[in-house]
Amino acid sequence: MTHQDTTQQRADWVEAAVPAEHTDEHDAGYPAHAAPGTEHTGREQLVLERIERARRARPRVREKLITLAHGAGGKATQSLIEAVFLDAFRNPALEPLEDAAAVTAGDTRLAFTTDSYVVSPLFFPGGNIGDLAVNGTVNDLAVSGARPVHLSTGFILEEGFPVEDLRRIVASMAAAAKAAGVSIVTGDTKVVQRGKGDGCYINTAGVGLVTGELNLGVATARPGDAVIVSGPVGDHGITIMLERGELDLEAELVSDTAPVH
């Protein structure tokens, strides 16, 4: 396949993926007298410009009802965040949409994050919703260049949830917090009617200290930067899917939930 063929295929694919409604139709044409051999280069440039205009376009949520896709972390989630939450709450700390917000208290630089955990099953090989809730929030702080210090936790429990299961979850949270060097300093508990929840949901928020001039985040990534991976990719997700019976295979995997710092 020639370079020209590859360029043509890429242009065709992107034109199909980016709706024309995101473009200014008056500048979407080709030069009337393009030099021989430059037609595809010109077309690719126009497609790239169309992509950039689409990125700058005001995000929209086309669905009338919330779907599971809106919580799956993909394109639907991003559209929901930008079109609903960011549009309403917009401020300089929120706009970067990083794992943690960069804020200050006097001369102290802080990272602040929150996350909610609705994993099912609650207990899985290698951990449970409790240590996952601690490690997930601690890691959002760590990858933002902060030293995690304090966490809050909120529980939404379903009527009829076994107290012994709650004790196991809380004990695992305490152990994970100790291992990560953080303190759980405040919390909240609510109980919903039987059938109105899935046993136990947990929210954790965390605060960490950022020292020096360190400034980590997606916005600072540049070509050539190293990507550091703390272990095998996907162990936790596949472990959960196996426990749910969603994969037609057998494997002895355990979740790798752990603090990365």
Where are these regions (language model features)?
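Helix-biased detector of long, well-ordered alpha-helical tracts
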Residues: 2-261
